[in-house]
Amino acid sequence: MLCCMRRTKQVEKNEDGDQKIDQDGNKPEDKAHKAATKIQASFRGHIIRKKMKDDKKDDNSEEAVENHKGEAKDEAATTENKTPKTEEPTADGPLEVKKEAISSPAEDKKQEPSSEKPKDTPSEENQASAESESTTKGSTENSPGVDASQAKEESKKADVPEATQDAASEKEQEKAESSQEDVKKDEVEEIKASESAQQDEAVSEEAKPDQENA
């Protein structure tokens, strides 16, 4: 019995040793596999995070564009809402005109009885109309004279510079003529002097042979 127990114990010890060896042999591979899986997982997570960030940026840009478009639409709507407000006074204009038209007949009716009571008012109105006609006639009669006087003054003003220009041109012509006359006089005097000198030379030459003959 003891021999059997010893043998069985030895067999169990050997089995435990084999299991330990198997566990030790599998551990490095398992570690390498786990490390590789961790690296792959971290790399995938990094890539996924980048994609998520890019998607968020795109979403933000699209949201910004949409917000800008919405703001532009809101501004256009506000401007459209503002423009009718400016036109509201013009819409009220006809109502005010109607009110004035309604009030004016009442005022005319009030004024008619007062005009019927005094009998001397038509004569005063006739006098006023006659005075106004006379004033208008006088103004119309005086206006042509005023226009004629203004036209004469303007023509005089227009003639004054022309006269000054004519006087200046005449003076220039006189100066030019006087200078030409002076030049002509100088030329005549020079010609006379040259002729007299030639005559003197001729007389002196004629006198020389006479002296020699004498």
Curated annotation (Swiss-Prot):
One of its GO terms (molecular function) is calmodulin binding. A lipid is attached at C3, C4 (S-palmitoyl cysteine). Keywords: Calmodulin-binding, Cell membrane, Cell projection, Developmental protein, Differentiation, Growth regulation, Lipoprotein, Membrane, Neurogenesis, Palmitate, Phosphoprotein, Synapse. Residues 1-214 are annotated as: Disordered. Residues 124-133 have a biased composition (Low complexity). It is a peripheral membrane protein. This is Neuromodulin. Gene3D superfamilies: 1.20.5.190. It comes from Xenopus laevis (African clawed frog). It is found in: Cell membrane; Cell projection, Growth cone membrane; Synapse; Cell projection, Filopodium membrane. It comes from the Eukaryota.
